[in-house]
Amino acid sequence: MAPACQILRWALALGLGLMFEVTHAFRSQDEFLSSLESYEIAFPTRVDHNGALLAFSPPPPRRQRRGTGATAESRLFYKVASPSTHFLLNLTRSSRLLAGHVSVEYWTREGLAWQRAARPHCLYAGHLQGQASTSHVAISTCGGLHGLIVADEEEYLIEPLHGGPKGSRSPEESGPHVVYKRSSLRHPHLDTACGVRDEKPWKGRPWWLRTLKPPPARPLGNETERGQPGLKRSVSRERYVETLVVADKMMVAYHGRRDVEQYVLAIMNIVAKLFQDSSLGSTVNILVTRLILLTEDQPTLEITHHAGKSLDSFCKWQKSIVNHSGHGNAIPENGVANHDTAVLITRYDICIYKNKPCGTLGLAPVGGMCERERSCSVNEDIGLATAFTIAHEIGHTFGMNHDGVGNSCGARGQDPAKLMAAHITMKTNPFVWSSCSRDYITSFLDSGLGLCLNNRPPRQDFVYPTVAPGQAYDADEQCRFQHGVKSRQCKYGEVCSELWCLSKSNRCITNSIPAAEGTLCQTHTIDKGWCYKRVCVPFGSRPEGVDGAWGPWTPWGDCSRTCGGGVSSSSRHCDSPRPTIGGKYCLGERRRHRSCNTDDCPPGSQDFREVQCSEFDSIPFRGKFYKWKTYRGGGVKACSLTCLAEGFNFYTERAAAVVDGTPCRPDTVDICVSGECKHVGCDRVLGSDLREDKCRVCGGDGSACETIEGVFSPASPGAGYEDVVWIPKGSVHIFIQDLNLSLSHLALKGDQESLLLEGLPGTPQPHRLPLAGTTFQLRQGPDQVQSLEALGPINASLIVMVLARTELPALRYRFNAPIARDSLPPYSWHYAPWTKCSAQCAGGSQVQAVECRNQLDSSAVAPHYCSAHSKLPKRQRACNTEPCPPDWVVGNWSLCSRSCDAGVRSRSVVCQRRVSAAEEKALDDSACPQPRPPVLEACHGPTCPPEWAALDWSECTPSCGPGLRHRVVLCKSADHRATLPPAHCSPAAKPPATMRCNLRRCPPARWVAGEWGECSAQCGVGQRQRSVRCTSHTGQASHECTEALRPPTTQQCEAKCDSPTPGDGPEECKDVNKVAYCPLVLKFQFCSRAYFRQMCCKTCHGH
């Protein structure tokens, strides 16, 4: 099996001759183009968000850097059309590529010559319009368009055509460009493979190969790293790789000072986008903090065809310039000049083992990230595809091996080889990471090797506008943009995923481009919506890319040990939902641990580290078999498995991490978890605060032992060994100090074994000396005073003896001796194990109760046996504080809409995440992975009884004044289909059949006068009469008329007399005798009336 070599011999089919140049394989762009199987010419045009040409307005008169062709806008749209392709690029400025205040440095042989601020304005990343989730674009707009377009499972590369026509163009036109597929590239080194073989001897290999590490022992899934000291392990957090980029003098000469800066940044722009892909399983930001362009050779930097020697020289050189540039030119200490990794881009055709050109493209140490002299790489410039080389090599510094080398990726039926493939073929997808790469970087960060990536450097931020182009241009107008002025929309189905338009030949066609965002749409669940990211959503809403959310915790795994304190683990994955459309990867704890099987192992059990070392006895090491035992010398990591070959004078690290639950050191109860030393309480529980007292009793009160200390002065110097003190069995915290600067000889005598220390100054420091069931450590302080210390307890009594040369005090001693069992109280308080966490997530609690135990057998007894005054306080701690995964929260069902027969009831259904015990956060429905529970359901009650049914009311009778309305009331069945006898319905519930009414007031009664009768006089004045009666509005007789308004019933009349006969005199004028009211007639001036004038002729005469 080939080791996970860091040499990248990617197939040169990645794209030769991109950007401003052609590679060493071709002398000109014409020669390069002739090598392609096919290519096309396109004229990229800057357009608006819907593909329409921009209105041209002349720029203001100002000086502009020649040839950039760039814009300062944060968002751009370009249309790239060729005979077989049609792309509408949606580009957004890459704000995360450059750290704040980054500068470009030009170095001569003497060091830094001059520097200026970097110009990030022409670096863009994005996607094809309407295809945010299925396409990728990384483009530099300086000097034309240079970059990659990934769409429809094909990679396209674009670069300006050299020597194109230079006629006048509008600012939106970019001139002729070459567009070709990566699959059309051909190169003689296509089958070049990794040049490292198994049979090469380990000794003598270059240092970057000696550091190779095996793949993770088991798939780590979605585990992430531990953080800096004090931070939790297995917690996913954002990482920031501050990157130094160096272009050698051949790069500067080839591309020219005018263009090399933007060319290099265009490459790094693609690198940054590759590390942003969610397939990496971690959030890693590539930031350029320093860009150095070498215009001359450097005195201490040797770059040649030999990749190994060039890498060695570059790694040392980049370390030397961290705080200085050139010969002592200081870089301001603002944090920007520091870097986590260094990238060299060279125009040399490099080769791994010889100083001649060959197919090697890159070289980097595996697992070198955050190590100052190993976090570096050399990369051959092959055009824009250099970005894949750099991303590949940085992957190696994260501990990634090649896909298929020491792992299953790339094998048949397994995850295909991807960005970390040893060489790229036409079937390889270099834009995503394989599951093996994800496991490698997770293991690397999980082991605490990425601490330097936790700090967040300053960066340049930009505000991006948000638009809804479909609101400005409806679907018909979008069709006219694509197919001419007579086109219009012709299919109205899933317009958000595919816009269908009438062609010039009046056929309904589509180019598979979705309608613009904001275009009106409708589905069976949305009456009025608009298109957003190829989906019809409620009008006005803008659902962004879905951020990842943690799924549920897996069940606790098996315990790592059967006794002595093991570890059980549980993990969760960022898949509820998975991050999509650029959504963020989950941050937070992804693996948790708990203690298990904490009881002591049986007496005589083999040391757990010894067991692990002995498992390698049957595995050959460099072709031979050895018996391995634990090595605990200086410089050994506490949680790595370092074993000594018994009988041989060498040791080696057999495993990067011991089995979980292994003690970190012999004199501590702390244990190793995932390669990191974790604190445990003396009860062997992770995270427990329970501590030993001075007697080494867990949770004790110090009453089980007494401290014995003193200073010994010899009685007869030189007379032989003298007894100093007797240390009883079970003593702990033993301390013996030599006060005579080793002018004494010390001995420890036991029942079965002894320890003699002579010539202490010559003993290697520190030294570990096993005796009486414990380990004594020989230490030497800064004042040269030596001491012998042991944690204990000792399993046999010891006598301290000394052979002194002077009468001066020779030894100081101190230890804690056990008190006789008879004098110990028989019962004492102890902490019980922690209870199970009260909640699975969002913050639960655990309680550690206190119980009274028998000191002799540790059995629990009734509380009254222990002293109430010494009772320990009950403990409580938080647990499972991480937020719960999104889930549906369902309310109670409402009452049925009907109390009998069939009805409907409803309830509230909300997608939310419980953040803590007192806080819940409502989320969009798409965040919940499970189907939404129903909001409505049918409900049924008892059969409804018959009921009264009333028909409509009749009109009010009479039409004015008080009246009545009438209606028909029937007894009906519950479904109103059958009419039943009235006895079937409740009489008390019967609605009324009549109702009083009063539409309006009736007209008042009025006087009605008849016709006048004939005059009573046949000649002269007389009277006539008529009838006057009071009638209602119905014509009936009434007594309600106003008397004052009653019309008269008589009237004076005058009949015409015949002519008088001769001799007849005039008739005498007199009052009628029967009338006595003539004076009143005169008084009230009624004489003008004919009647009164006739009746009172005399009285009225003359008036």
From Swiss-Prot:
Location of the Peptidase M12B domain: 239-457
Keywords of this entry: Cleavage on pair of basic residues, Disease variant, Disulfide bond, Dwarfism, Extracellular matrix, Glycoprotein, Hydrolase, Metal-binding, Metalloprotease, Protease, Repeat, Secreted, Signal, Zinc, Zymogen
Chief place where the protein resides: secreted
Cysteine pairings via disulfide bonds: C315-C376, C351-C358, C370-C452, C409-C436, C479-C501, C490-C508, C496-C531, C521-C536, C559-C596, C563-C601, C574-C586
Annotated Disintegrin domain residues: 460-546
GO biological process, any: extracellular matrix organization
Propeptide residue range(s): 26-233
Signal peptide span: 1-25
Residue positions with a glycan: N90, N222, N323, N740, N795, N892
SUPFAM superfamilies: Metalloproteases ('zincins'), catalytic domain, TSP-1 type 1 repeat
Residues forming coiled coils: none
One term under GO cellular component: microfibril
EC numbers: 3.4.24.-
Localization per Swiss-Prot or TrEMBL: Secreted, Extracellular space, Extracellular matrix
Binding positions for Zn(2+) per the UniProt entry: H392, H396, H402
Cofactor(s) annotated in UniProt: Zn(2+)
Catalytic machinery residues: E393
Cofactor binding: number and manner: Binds 1 zinc ion per subunit.
Limits of the PLAC domain: 1065-1103
Pfam families assigned to the protein according to its UniProt record, in alphabetical order: ADAMTS_CR_2, ADAMTS_CR_3, ADAMTS_spacer1, Pep_M12B_propep, PLAC, Reprolysin, TSP1_ADAMTS, TSP_1
Gene Ontology MF terms: metal ion binding; metalloendopeptidase activity
Function: Metalloprotease that participate in microfibrils assembly. Microfibrils are extracellular matrix components occurring independently or along with elastin in the formation of elastic tissues.
Cross-referenced PANTHER family: A DISINTEGRIN AND METALLOPROTEINASE WITH THROMBOSPONDIN MOTIFS 10, ADAMTS A DISINTEGRIN AND METALLOPROTEASE WITH THROMBOSPONDIN MOTIFS PROTEASE
Disease annotated for this entry: Weill-Marchesani syndrome 1: A rare connective tissue disorder characterized by short stature, brachydactyly, joint stiffness, and eye abnormalities including microspherophakia, ectopia lentis, severe myopia and glaucoma.
Domain observations: The spacer domain and the TSP type-1 domains are important for a tight interaction with the extracellular matrix.
UniProt-recorded name of the protein: A disintegrin and metalloproteinase with thrombospondin motifs 10
Species assigned in the record: Homo sapiens
